[in-house]
Structures are given as C-alpha cells and as structure tokens.
Curated annotation (Swiss-Prot):
Residues of the transit peptide: 1-32
Native species: Eremothecium gossypii (strain ATCC 10895 / CBS 109.51 / FGSC 9923 / NRRL Y-1056)
Annotated gene: MGM101
Record's protein name: Mitochondrial genome maintenance protein MGM101
Biological process, per Gene Ontology: interstrand cross-link repair; mitochondrial genome maintenance; recombinational repair
Transit peptide in keyword set: yes
Pfam families associated with the record: Mgm101p
Keyword annotations of the record: DNA damage, DNA repair, DNA-binding, Mitochondrion, Mitochondrion nucleoid, Transit peptide
Function description: Performs an essential function in the repair of oxidatively damaged mtDNA that is required for the maintenance of the mitochondrial genome. Binds to DNA.
C-alpha cells in the first residue's frame, strides 16, 4: 500500500515554498516490488545495469512456438525458369542410371582401415568418408543435400528431412536426427542431424553396404577387432567393450 503525505508550506524570508509530496511505501509493497524486479531480471537477463538478451529464457519461449528455421515459401525465395524446387520435387528419381565409372566408384569395397567400431560393437564409417566417396564419384560440386522440411526441435532432439541430389537428379530422401542436452548444443546438433541424413541417403547408392551385411560384420570383427574388459575412470564400473586390434583403450576407460 502506498501513502502520500500532505504538502507543507515552508516560509523562508519573503519567499514561500511548497514542499513536494513525500511517497512512503509500506514494507509489504517494498518486498513485492523487489520480488517483481528479481523476476524481471531472471526473465530478461538483466545483470546490474546491463541487459543481456536471450538469457534466462527457455527455448520454447524464445522460439514462441515456431520451428527453428522458418519455411522459405513466399518469404523472398524466387524460383527461376527451369530451376527445381528440391523441397517438394522428385525430379530425376529413377529416371536413368549413372555412368559406369560412377557406379564402380560407389560399389567399391571399403578399406578396412576406414571402418570404425563403437564400444558396443557397432561398425560404422565416419561421415567425412561418405563425403570423400561422393566427391570421387560425382566430383566436388556434383552433388548436394537439399532440405525437404523445417528443422524440428523437441526437448531433446533435432530432426530434419534432406534430399541427396547428384548430377541434377534426386537420389534419395532421408530424415536425420541428433540428440542434444543443453540449448547451446542445438547448432551443433543441427549439423549432426545433417550428417546423419547424409549417411542414410548414401545407403540407397550402395556406399558402405557391407556394414549392414551380417556375414561381413562377423568376419570383420574376427579379423580386425577384439573385446576387452575395462574400468570407467569416474564410476569405477567394469565392462566389456569392442575396439580395433590396432587401437589402445582411450578415456574414459582404462
């Protein structure tokens, strides 16, 4: 509750002055105002007299219910005559096979040194190796990933659909996904989402197809991999992990 004290007349010699009303604030009102100010600081990110935009706001509130990347339709995107809108088009899908040299490069067996294995025993090809194979087959600039949807951000996941276009024709469409743990990790997760979509699209070209062949997987593990009991340095828990025979146990295991 706010009270206003009555004005007082002050006589000083020949002059008369009117004192301004004095505003007195009750203790309860002071506490309420302080609480409101603290809430505003947490919301807007005010630190002392500085305003730090964006801090203290949740991702959901910051996006305002919108997706991370807005649809470009009608937003200044101009399609020239003869161009293809890869967000919707299936231009060239299954229209014609690639030249024989391209197919030979795509079907080439993977080098054993290029294949990695995860601690749980899953074989995989690093994402950069997929890009190198595409560059050898189609040439640098002869292929690309075109987004087919908006970037969807959930509480723990980033996902987006991409199309792989090679020599002007659609080859494959796949949805990439990537987990994240804090809001500042979203930009990195969007790149991981793109890499995941690239790997899935390359399956339709036959790149690294042996990684899904049970016979090859068993043979590769027997020749190039081994299982070892290790201890986690932090939790001190012991477990069995897979690793290549030419590799050493790395952190966080010993």
């Amino acid at each position: 509750m706010i009270r206003f004290c009555s004005a007082r007349l002050i006589q000083r010699g020949l002059h008369t002055a009117v004192a301004k009303p004095v505003m007195a604030t009750s203790t309860a009102a002071s506490r309420a105002a302080a609480s409101k100010m603290a809430g505003a600081q947490a919301e807007t990110g005010v630190v002392g007299s500085r305003l730090v935009p964006g801090y203290g706001r949740t991702l959901t509130r910051a996006l305002g219910g919108q997706v991370l990347e807005a649809d470009t339709e009608g937003g200044g995107h101009v399609m020239t005559e003869g161009s293809v809108d890869w967000r919707r088009s299936f231009h060239g899908l299954g229209a014609k096979p690639f030249a024989a040299p391209v197919q030979e490069e795509l079907a080439r067996a993977l080098e054993p040194l290029d294949i990695e294995i995860k601690p749980d025993g899953l074989l995989y090809l690093p994402e950069i190796k997929y890009r190198r194979i595409l560059n050898r087959a189609f040439g640098a600039g002869g292929w690309g990933l075109a987004p087919r949807s908006d970037t969807i951000v959930t509480a723990k996941l980033v996902t987006r659909e991409y199309a792989l276009v090679c020599h002007g024709q659609l080859v494959s469409v796949a949805r990439g996904e990537q987990d994240y743990f804090i809001d500042t990790g979203i930009p990195t997760a969007t790149e991981g989402c793109k890499s995941n979509a690239l790997m899935r699209c390359c399956k339709d070209l036959g790149i690294g197809s042996e990684l899904w062949d049970p016979v090859f997987i068993k043979k590769f593990k027997k020749e190039y991999c081994m299982e070892r009991f290790v201890e986690h340095l932090t939790t001190k828990k012991k477990k069995k992990i897979w690793l290549r025979k030419d590799r050493e146990v790395e952190y966080p295991y010993k």
